[in-house]
Protein backbone atom coordinates (compact mmCIF):
# COMPACT_ATOMS: atom_id res chain seq x y z
CA UNK A 1 0.00 0.00 0.00
CA UNK A 2 2.81 2.42 0.90
CA UNK A 3 4.54 1.77 -2.44
CA UNK A 4 1.26 2.46 -4.33
CA UNK A 5 0.80 5.82 -2.56
CA UNK A 6 4.44 6.76 -3.22
CA UNK A 7 4.19 5.90 -6.95
CA UNK A 8 0.80 7.63 -7.26
CA UNK A 9 2.14 10.76 -5.57
CA UNK A 10 5.17 10.72 -7.88
CA UNK A 11 2.97 10.46 -10.97
CA UNK A 12 0.77 13.29 -9.71
CA UNK A 13 3.79 15.57 -9.20
CA UNK A 14 5.07 14.68 -12.68
CA UNK A 15 1.67 15.45 -14.25
CA UNK A 16 1.50 18.87 -12.57
CA UNK A 17 5.07 19.66 -13.64
CA UNK A 18 4.43 18.77 -17.27
CA UNK A 19 1.16 20.69 -17.44
CA UNK A 20 3.04 23.99 -17.09
CA UNK A 21 5.54 23.39 -19.89
CA UNK A 22 5.12 25.96 -22.62
CA UNK A 23 1.98 27.39 -21.07
CA UNK A 24 1.34 30.82 -19.64
CA UNK A 25 -0.75 29.49 -16.78
CA UNK A 26 -1.36 32.81 -15.02
CA UNK A 27 -1.96 34.94 -18.15
CA UNK A 28 -5.22 35.30 -20.09
CA UNK A 29 -5.51 33.86 -23.57
CA UNK A 30 -3.49 35.88 -26.09
CA UNK A 31 -1.03 37.12 -23.47
CA UNK A 32 2.47 35.76 -22.78
CA UNK A 33 4.37 35.75 -19.51
CA UNK A 34 7.76 36.64 -18.15
CA UNK A 35 8.34 36.15 -14.43
CA UNK A 36 5.14 37.39 -12.73
CA UNK A 37 3.98 39.77 -15.49
CA UNK A 38 1.79 39.20 -18.55
CA UNK A 39 2.26 40.96 -21.91
CA UNK A 40 0.26 41.42 -25.07
CA UNK A 41 1.44 42.74 -28.43
CA UNK A 42 -1.28 44.98 -29.85
CA UNK A 43 -1.51 45.21 -33.62
CA UNK A 44 -3.49 48.50 -33.67
CA UNK A 45 -1.86 51.83 -34.54
CA UNK A 46 -2.40 54.35 -31.75
CA UNK A 47 -0.86 57.48 -30.26
CA UNK A 48 0.95 56.95 -26.96
CA UNK A 49 -2.02 58.23 -24.91
CA UNK A 50 -4.51 56.14 -26.90
CA UNK A 51 -2.31 53.07 -26.43
CA UNK A 52 -2.12 53.65 -22.67
CA UNK A 53 -5.92 53.97 -22.44
CA UNK A 54 -6.32 50.80 -24.52
CA UNK A 55 -4.03 48.84 -22.16
CA UNK A 56 -5.96 50.09 -19.13
CA UNK A 57 -9.27 49.05 -20.73
CA UNK A 58 -7.90 45.71 -21.98
CA UNK A 59 -6.95 44.31 -18.58
CA UNK A 60 -7.31 45.32 -14.94
CA UNK A 61 -3.99 46.91 -13.86
CA UNK A 62 -2.95 47.08 -17.53
CA UNK A 63 -0.43 49.70 -18.65
CA UNK A 64 1.95 50.27 -21.51
CA UNK A 65 4.88 48.01 -20.64
CA UNK A 66 7.75 48.97 -18.38
CA UNK A 67 11.03 47.11 -18.96
CA UNK A 68 12.94 46.75 -15.73
CA UNK A 69 15.82 44.38 -16.46
CA UNK A 70 17.89 42.80 -19.23
CA UNK A 71 16.10 39.43 -18.96
CA UNK A 72 12.76 41.11 -19.54
CA UNK A 73 14.22 43.05 -22.48
CA UNK A 74 15.55 39.87 -24.11
CA UNK A 75 12.23 38.01 -23.62
CA UNK A 76 10.32 40.88 -25.25
CA UNK A 77 12.83 41.02 -28.11
CA UNK A 78 12.30 37.31 -28.78
CA UNK A 79 8.50 37.66 -28.74
CA UNK A 80 8.43 40.74 -31.00
CA UNK A 81 10.89 39.25 -33.46
CA UNK A 82 8.52 36.29 -34.01
CA UNK A 83 5.72 38.66 -34.99
CA UNK A 84 7.05 41.92 -36.41
CA UNK A 85 10.31 42.91 -38.04
CA UNK A 86 10.01 46.53 -39.19
CA UNK A 87 7.56 48.15 -36.77
CA UNK A 88 8.56 50.33 -33.79
CA UNK A 89 6.45 49.70 -30.67
CA UNK A 90 5.29 52.05 -27.89
CA UNK A 91 6.36 51.19 -24.34
CA UNK A 92 5.35 52.90 -21.09
CA UNK A 93 8.28 55.30 -20.79
CA UNK A 94 7.82 59.05 -21.15
CA UNK A 95 9.51 62.29 -20.24
CA UNK A 96 7.91 64.00 -17.28
CA UNK A 97 7.39 67.59 -18.37
CA UNK A 98 7.07 68.60 -14.72
CA UNK A 99 10.33 66.99 -13.53
CA UNK A 100 12.24 66.66 -16.85
CA UNK A 101 13.11 63.03 -16.11
CA UNK A 102 12.13 59.77 -17.83
CA UNK A 103 9.40 57.87 -15.95
CA UNK A 104 7.61 54.55 -16.38
CA UNK A 105 3.84 55.01 -16.56
CA UNK A 106 3.33 52.26 -13.95
CA UNK A 107 5.46 54.16 -11.42
CA UNK A 108 8.31 51.62 -11.34
CA UNK A 109 11.84 53.00 -11.14
CA UNK A 110 13.92 53.47 -14.29
CA UNK A 111 16.70 51.07 -13.27
CA UNK A 112 18.36 50.78 -16.67
CA UNK A 113 18.42 52.68 -19.93
CA UNK A 114 18.74 51.12 -23.36
CA UNK A 115 18.86 54.11 -25.68
CA UNK A 116 19.98 53.75 -29.28
CA UNK A 117 23.14 55.70 -30.08
CA UNK A 118 22.38 59.42 -30.21
CA UNK A 119 19.10 59.03 -28.33
CA UNK A 120 17.18 60.51 -26.66
CA UNK A 121 17.50 63.54 -28.92
CA UNK A 122 14.09 65.25 -28.52
CA UNK A 123 13.97 65.93 -32.27
CA UNK A 124 12.10 69.18 -33.01
CA UNK A 125 11.61 69.52 -29.23
CA UNK A 126 8.53 67.29 -29.25
CA UNK A 127 9.71 63.73 -28.51
CA UNK A 128 8.49 62.84 -25.04
CA UNK A 129 7.45 59.17 -25.45
CA UNK A 130 9.47 56.03 -26.17
CA UNK A 131 9.39 53.12 -28.62
CA UNK A 132 11.29 49.86 -28.80
CA UNK A 133 13.01 50.06 -32.18
CA UNK A 134 12.71 47.33 -34.78
CA UNK A 135 16.22 48.03 -36.13
CA UNK A 136 17.65 47.00 -32.73
CA UNK A 137 15.54 43.81 -32.67
CA UNK A 138 13.45 45.53 -30.00
CA UNK A 139 16.35 45.79 -27.55
CA UNK A 140 16.92 49.58 -27.73
CA UNK A 141 14.81 52.68 -27.22
CA UNK A 142 14.15 55.87 -29.18
CA UNK A 143 12.21 58.93 -28.12
CA UNK A 144 9.33 59.84 -30.45
CA UNK A 145 6.53 62.36 -30.81
CA UNK A 146 3.70 61.03 -28.60
CA UNK A 147 1.15 61.91 -31.29
CA UNK A 148 2.65 59.54 -33.85
CA UNK A 149 0.88 56.21 -34.25
CA UNK A 150 2.63 52.94 -33.44
CA UNK A 151 1.74 49.44 -32.41
CA UNK A 152 2.31 48.83 -28.71
CA UNK A 153 2.92 46.49 -25.80
CA UNK A 154 0.58 46.15 -22.81
CA UNK A 155 1.62 44.67 -19.47
CA UNK A 156 -0.01 43.75 -16.19
Curated annotation (Swiss-Prot):
Pfam families: Lectin_C (PF00059). Residues 1-23 form the signal peptide. The keyword Membrane does not apply. Its main location: secreted. Glycans are attached at residues 35, 109. It is found in: Secreted. Residues 34-155 form the C-type lectin domain. Ca(2+) binds at residues 127, 142-143. Keywords: Calcium, Disulfide bond, Glycoprotein, Lectin, Metal-binding, Secreted, Signal. Mannose-binding lectin which recognizes specific carbohydrate structures and agglutinates a variety of animal cells by binding to cell-surface glycoproteins and glycolipids. May be a calcium-dependent lectin. This is C-type lectin lectoxin-Phi2.
Amino acid sequence: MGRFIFVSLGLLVLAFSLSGIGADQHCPSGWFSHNVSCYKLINDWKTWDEAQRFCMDEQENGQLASINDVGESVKLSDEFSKTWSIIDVWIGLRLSKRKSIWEWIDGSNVTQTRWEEGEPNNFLKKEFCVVLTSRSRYLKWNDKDCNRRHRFLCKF
